[in-house]
Structures are given as C-alpha cells and as structure tokens.
Design a protein with these regions (language model features):
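N-terminal J-domain/J-like co-chaperone modules of DnaJ/Hsp40 proteins
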Residues: 1-55
C-alpha cells in the first residue's frame, strides 16, 4: 500500500499529523471493528494504512 492510498483510506490529507492519523484510525476502527459486528476487510485496510503511515 502506498502512503497516498493509506491517507485516502483513513480519509486524511497527505499533510496530516501523526495525531490526526491516530485519531482517524481510532474513529474508523470503532465503526468497523469485527467484535462490534463490523467488517474484517475494512479493519485490515485501516490496520495496514496505520502501519504504513506510522511505521
């Protein structure tokens, strides 16, 4: 996954700060977490995007 795609998945601009990445990841995971009946596909996408952006 590219950094640009990771920003797109997390609904952020490419100049987002580390804190904004964390906040977006947390917000989105609360919506799609598999333990809450959400999608494992989207959870994996958000996890990968966070890993790409935060290392």
């Amino acid at each position: 996954m590219t950094r640009a795609r990771a920003f797109e998945i997390l609904e952020l601009s490419e100049n987002a700060t580390r804190d904004q990445v964390v906040d977006a990841y947390t917000r989105l995971m609360k919506q799609v977490h598999p333990d809450k009946g959400g999608s494992t596909y989207f959870a994996k996408q958000f996890n990968e995007a966070r890993e790409v952006l935060l290392g």
